[in-house]
Amino acid sequence: MAVSRRRVPQAGARSFFCALLLSFSQFTGSDGTGGDAAAPGAAGTQAELPHRRFEYKYSFKGPHLVQSDGTVPFWAHAGNAIPSADQIRIAPSLKSQRGSVWTKAKAAFENWEVEVTFRVTGRGRIGADGLAIWYTENQGLDGPVFGSADTWNGVGIFFDSFDNDGKKNNPAIVVIGNNGQINYDHQNDGATQALASCQRDFRNKPYPVRAKITYYQKTLTVMINNGFTPDKNDYEFCAKVENMVIPTQGHFGISAATGGLADDHDVLSFLTFQLTEPGKEPPTAEKDISEKEKEKYQEEFEHFQQELDKKKEEFQKGHPDLQGQPADDIFESIGDRELRQVFEGQNRIHLEIKQLNRQLDMILDEQRRYVSSLTEEISRRGAGTPGQPGQVSQQELDTVVKSQQEILRQVNEVKNSMSETVRLVSGIQHPGSAGVYETTQHFMDIKEHLHVVKRDIDSLAQRSMPSNEKPKCPDLPPFPSCLSTIHFVIFVVVQTVLFVGYIMYRTQQEAAAKKFF
């Protein structure tokens, strides 16, 4: 690998585009079309995308979110939830608060997708407790599980911000299913019940965090926009659960709770879409809207249209100088058109590379699950009684594990190369005076500096070892002579005699001194 890396700067732009084409070819089929990692249940080509239909009765979005009586149309809120014109504060930043909002009507969608935009903000570095997005058979208006009821029948996607088990794996996003008979393991953050999870920090972000949850062909996929950029479509893969069975009819909901620590949990929008598989006839909106509602909506539309026409006339009367703008200002120039086309092309390349990055994340997640399952199988068989004729299957499992690890390594290398490609494309999107020649010259300078450092190290090594002679240890100093036994005994006897004589002399002096008193 070291040889190929030194040749990359010399190849210049040609090697870069060859690597880009090779990376694209690894993830395309025989017909030249690639899969869509962001699409729900993407197993085919991009042409086989499901039909999306917006369901307004299972959605809310600001502005003008609440009615005059403080309620949200088609939704019911409970607990400490506070609806406002632009958002719904599910749980305020006070201790021991919990609230929730739920759809009033049950949804009977075979496949669906929800897009939730929310903010979790707090003053401290650690927050609590978190927020949950639900699809359950019944409404859980109040309860101990992030403000909702326990033993639910359905699925919950938990945005857990507090580390209850002390494993330092929070904030985390956890997918937990329930059949209505299991109590949530709150002390361990549901680690033993999690179907899938990922670690993402969703607190105190500069932009709202977005979650896209897709249930398509019995596969639940969670995509996250971490809120670092204003791009609404900048999603990354988080979790995926296959062969998941949920109730055919259920309520959508979102809940939140606080504990000793408290965050503000605000939901800006909750958009629901019904998905229809390709080849099937999409549902028509006329079947759901009655004639009275149609007439009512038509009257409202005509009323708003008349008000708009009046506002236009008033604006034109108040601003006569803005009428009759030159036609040249309306159309773009040739330079503007060319610049727009260049940026659009570069943006498409950037989006394709990000799509490949998402697909690599999904492949890595699947490979990790396969490796973990095989490792558990190996450990379970290894814990059995020895001497059984199962060594052949053990070797096969070891071979499969090694091959899976090799695949993971190769996928990581491809991902790293794609990240480098994204960096180079980002550099191309900012054109300046530096070209391909200057970039190549920069790499050549780095290579030359590395050679100089290596030469200096070699010279230092040769200078420290001028010959092949082995290093000798220094000679030991002369051992000091010890005192003999006779001298030691004489010294002790003399010292004892002197001590006894001193005691006797002192006693006589004290006795003589007492005669004078």
Curated annotation (Swiss-Prot):
Self-association state and partner proteins as the record states: Exists both as a covalent disulfide-linked homohexamer, and a complex of three disulfide-linked dimers non-covalently kept together. Interacts with MCFD2. May interact with TMEM115. Interacts with RAB3GAP1 and RAB3GAP2. Interacts with UBXN6. Interacts with SERPINA1/alpha1-antitrypsin. Interacts with BET1.
Native source organism of the sequence: Mus musculus (Mouse)
Keyword Membrane: yes
Positions contributing to a carbohydrate binding: 96, 129, 164, 186, 259-261
Any one Gene Ontology cellular component term annotated for this protein: COPII-coated ER to Golgi transport vesicle
Residue intervals of the L-type lectin-like domain: 52-275
Entry keyword set: Disulfide bond, Endoplasmic reticulum, ER-Golgi transport, Golgi apparatus, Lectin, Membrane, Metal-binding, Phosphoprotein, Protein transport, Signal, Transmembrane, Transmembrane helix, Transport
Family annotation (InterPro entries): ConA-like_dom_sf, Intracellular_Lectin-GPT, Lectin_leg
Protein's name in the database: Protein ERGIC-53
Membrane-side (Lumenal) residue stretches: 31-484
Protein's cellular compartments: Endoplasmic reticulum-Golgi intermediate compartment membrane; Golgi apparatus membrane; Endoplasmic reticulum membrane
